[in-house]
């Protein structure tokens, strides 16, 4: 069985030609596939019946995701779904909606997709990391998460504007499937999302960052740093591997030089762990002057023992970075009360 959401447009075109049909038949499949959301090949009536039958006989399917559970935040801006994928596995995906800023802009509908079920990185403050690793997701299963939310938004006259690979799992540990999904979702004959509207987050797998830099894509990169030195980082990310903090920062700089895209360093701020003024100054010395940006994330509640810093400590940490010449922001919180925020995803049904 082959899921049509796995195929790049050029692969779809080759398929129909090899089956003896004109190349335009590929677009007759691709257009409804990404904009009409069919559940079966027979839901595409503009295709000849014979072609639909041949697709079915050859084992081609449309693997849409099935919603198992939905939780919506009190303000209605965040929706978390537990989805059953076409292979029977389950994964969490989140939609975050943002109003236009006071200085302009447009409403944003950002989907946070998962690339794995569980995660092997073992970050001690992350609910997904505490699940352990189960399996990698195929490209079609990553794409189907986006398609499911795209269909929900379309019913409200809205559309997907942004995509972040910040859900369950480490994208760089599933590189080939992740990048195939990116290419499908950004292809002008596929889902058609602009490359600059996508951000991939990584714990700092430098080999993956180097490969991504060579893809000639204009996508954003976010690196989860969480500590300015190797000793502290090893405690927070026990499976960080051979990549030192210095290696990770260098890979971010190299990515910026290669792509021209600013790199964001994610920093989960934890009371009494990595939020002291001394650590803020240490972080500033590492990052100042390299064009990077720090996204400060006051830790979200999980089953662990880590506590969220006081607003005073968060502000002080931010001010130290700013006064040292490091661009930074404190992340706008979305979905914390429904366990849909950073570091909270797992496949339990709660609420």
UniProtKB/Swiss-Prot annotation:
Tell me one GO biological process term: tRNA methylation
Q: Where is the active site?
A: 92 (proton acceptor), 342 (s-methylcysteine intermediate)
List UniProt keywords, sorted A-Z: 4Fe-4S, Cytoplasm, Disulfide bond, Iron, Iron-sulfur, Metal-binding, Methyltransferase, rRNA processing, S-adenosyl-L-methionine, Transferase
Q: Which Gene3D superfamilies match?
A: 1.10.150.530, Aldolase class I
The primary gene name is: rlmN
| Cofactors demanded by this protein | [4Fe-4S] cluster
PANTHER family from the xrefs?
Answer: 23S RRNA METHYLTRANSFERASE (PTHR30544), RADICAL SAM CORE DOMAIN-CONTAINING PROTEIN (PTHR30544:SF5)
Q: What's the protein name?
A: Ribosomal RNA large subunit methyltransferase N
HAMAP family of this UniProt entry? RNA_methyltr_RlmN
Q: Which organism is it from?
A: Nitrosopumilus maritimus (strain SCM1)
UniProt xrefs under SUPFAM superfamilies: Radical SAM enzymes
Single GO MF annotation: rRNA binding
Record-annotated residues binding [4Fe-4S] cluster?
119, 123, 126
The note on the cofactor says: Binds 1 [4Fe-4S] cluster. The cluster is coordinated with 3 cysteines and an exchangeable S-adenosyl-L-methionine.
Q: List the disulfide bonds.
A: 112-342
> What Gene Ontology terms describe where this protein resides (cellular component)?
cytoplasm
- Membrane-crossing segments per the record: none
Q: What residues does S-adenosyl-L-methionine bind to? A: 169-170, 201, 224-226, 300
Q: Which residues belong to the signal peptide in this entry? A: none
Q: Where in the cell is it found?
A: Cytoplasm
Give all residue intervals belonging to the Radical SAM core domain.
105-337
What is the role of this chain? Specifically methylates position 2 of adenine 2503 in 23S rRNA.
Which CDD domains does this UniProt record tie to the protein? Answer: Radical_SAM
Q: Which family does it belong to?
A: Belongs to the radical SAM superfamily. RlmN family.
């Amino acid at each position: 069985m082959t899921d049509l959401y796995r195929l790049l447009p050029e692969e779809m075109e080759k398929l129909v030609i090899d089956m003896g049909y004109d190349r335009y038949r590929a677009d007759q499949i691709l257009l409804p596939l990404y904009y009409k959301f069919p559940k079966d090949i027979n839901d595409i009536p503009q295709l000849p019946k014979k072609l639909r039958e041949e697709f079915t006989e050859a084992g081609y399917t449309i693997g849409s995701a099935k919603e198992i559970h939905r939780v919506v935040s009190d303000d209605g801006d965040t929706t978390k779904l537990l989805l059953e994928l076409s292979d029977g596995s389950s994964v969490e995906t989140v939609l975050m909606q943002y109003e236009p800023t006071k200085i302009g802009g447009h409403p944003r509908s950002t989907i946070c997709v998962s690339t794995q079920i569980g995660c092997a990185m073992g970050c001690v403050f992350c609910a997904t990391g505490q699940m352990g690793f189960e399996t990698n997701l195929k490209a079609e299963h990553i794409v189907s998460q986006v398609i499911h939310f795209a269909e929900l938004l379309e019913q409200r006259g809205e559309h997907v504007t942004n995509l972040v690979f910040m859900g369950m799992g480490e994208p760089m540990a599933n590189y080939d499937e992740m990048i195939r999904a990116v290419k499908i979702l950004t292809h002008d004959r596929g889902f058609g999302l602009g490359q600059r509207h996508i951000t991939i987050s990584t714990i700092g797998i430098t080999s993956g960052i180097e490969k991504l830099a060579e893809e000639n894509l204009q996508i954003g990169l976010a690196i989860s740093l969480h500590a300015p030195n190797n000793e502290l980082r090893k405690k927070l990310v026990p499976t960080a591997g051979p990549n030192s903090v210095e290696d990770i920062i260098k890979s971010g700089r190299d990515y910026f030089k290669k792509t021209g895209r600013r790199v964001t360093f994610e920093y989960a701020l934890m009371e009494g762990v990595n939020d002291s003024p001394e650590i803020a100054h240490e972080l500033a010395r590492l990052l100042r002057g390299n064009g990077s940006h720090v996204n400060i994330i006051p830790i979200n509640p999980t089953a662990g023992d880590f506590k969220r810093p006081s607003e005073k400590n968060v502000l002080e940490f931010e001010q130290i970075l700013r006064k040292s010449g490091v661009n930074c922001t404190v992340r706008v919180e979305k979905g914390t009360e429904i366990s849909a925020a950073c570091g909270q995803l797992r496949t339990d049904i709660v609420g």
